[in-house]
UniProtKB/Swiss-Prot annotation:
Compartments in which it is found: Nucleus
UniProt protein name: Zinc finger protein 771
Biological source species: Mus musculus
Coiled coil: none
Keyword Metal-binding carried by entry: yes
ZnF (C2H2-type) intervals: 63-85, 91-113, 119-141, 147-169, 175-197, 203-225, 231-253, 259-281
Family (UniProt): Belongs to the krueppel C2H2-type zinc-finger protein family.
Alphabetized Gene3D superfamilies for the sequence: Classic Zinc Finger (3.30.160.60)
Described purpose of this protein according to its UniProt entry: May be involved in transcriptional regulation.
Sites of the Glycyl lysine isopeptide (Lys-Gly) (interchain with G-Cter in SUMO2) crosslink: 33
């Protein structure tokens, strides 16, 4: 197993390559300790910063970054950190040519080619290629959620999930769809959205072969085969496979009819009933003129019982 120093270097690279996010109580060797130090998400090789703190006056960390103010105990650590601003990536993989800003990151990346997984979970024996991945995995066993949102108090086990959640409060959406321009707060949300353009359906049902673009859609579909109905009505106890079906059913108890018809004022409990009703209005009010062949509608005051076979233009000629 790699030494403790190598594990610390890989954890530092994990933060610098993918996300720089320190929460109060966490501290890496030689780095300033902040409640929220910095959030760095790769968006077209640009940096997105959030809640940038003022540097500490701690004499134990005299080397401050001129770009963001973060302080370090060693000049060499500052030099490594500076690459997050300059974009310099001097360490190249001999297998695929991919470049990295830290040597430890190249070492960790090399395991994707060799298949080496030196970090093993003592709980379930699952193995990982990076110490940080093992540390995140172990929180599934311990239930630890060290990342707390200062806005709503919600806690997260992974810094990446916490960073994405913060954008709910800030409104930041750095991931834009190249096809339609729609922006998203997380890369995973963008990846799911892009399937609406590509038509990709990577999730297949093992029972019937039906494919889905979203894993959540597959999970819902599976209930057709398993008969699972996890959503229970609190009033009558009836169970449903989908939350939307439960919401529609609940209106039989509350009497709510949220879909009003603008033509006649009648209200409906289900959207499907409302749509069917609207089509009935359209059929009654749409006619083909016997004179010119164009379709036309009757005035709102007219009824289906007194239609005319000619449009107003032909009728007046």
């Amino acid at each position: 197993m790699p030494g403790e120093q190598q594990a610390e270097e890989e954890e530092e690279e994990e933060m610098q390559e993918e996300m720089v996010l320190l929460v109060k109580g966490e501290e890496e060797e030689g780095e300033e300790k902040y409640e929220v130090v910095k959030l760095k998400i790769p968006v077209d090789n640009k940096e997105v910063a959030s809640q940038m703190p003022a540097p500490s006056a701690d004499p134990a960390r005299p080397h401050a970054c001129p770009d963001c103010g973060r302080a370090f105990a060693r000049r060499s650590t500052l030099a490594k950190h500076a690459r997050t601003h300059t974009g310099e990536r001097p360490f190249a993989c001999t297998e695929c040519g991919r470049c990295f800003s830290q040597k430890s990151a190249l070492t960790k990346h090399g395991r994707t080619h060799t298949g080496e997984r030196p970090y093993q979970c003592p709980e379930c024996d699952k193995r990982f290629s990076a110490a940080s991945n093992l540390r995140q995995h172990r929180r599934r066993h311990t239930g630890e959620k060290p990342y707390a949102c200062a806005h709503c108090g919600r806690r997260f086990a992974q810094s990446s999930n916490y960073a994405q959640h913060l954008r709910v409060h800030t409104g930041e959406k750095p991931y834009a769809c190249p096809d339609c321009g729609r922006a998203f707060g997380g890369s995973s949300c963008l990846a799911r959205h892009r399937r609406t353009h590509t038509g990709e359906r990577p999730y297949a049902c093992a029972d019937c072969g039906t494919r889905f673009a979203q894993s959540s859609a597959l999970a819902k579909h599976r209930r057709v085969h398993t008969g699972e109905k996890p959503h229970r009505c609190a009033v009558c106890g009836r169970r449903f496979g989908h939350r939307s079906n439960l919401a529609e059913h609940a209106r039989t108890h509350t009497g709510e009819r949220p879909y009003p018809c603008t033509e006649c004022g009648r209200r409906f409990r289900l959207s499907s009933h409302f749509i069917r009703h609207r089509r009935a209005h359209m059929r009654r009010r749409l006619y083909i003129c016997a004179g010119c062949g164009r379709d036309f509608k009757l005035p709102a005051s007219a009824t289906a019982a007194t239609p005319t076979e000619r449009c107003p233009e032909c009728e007046g000629s």
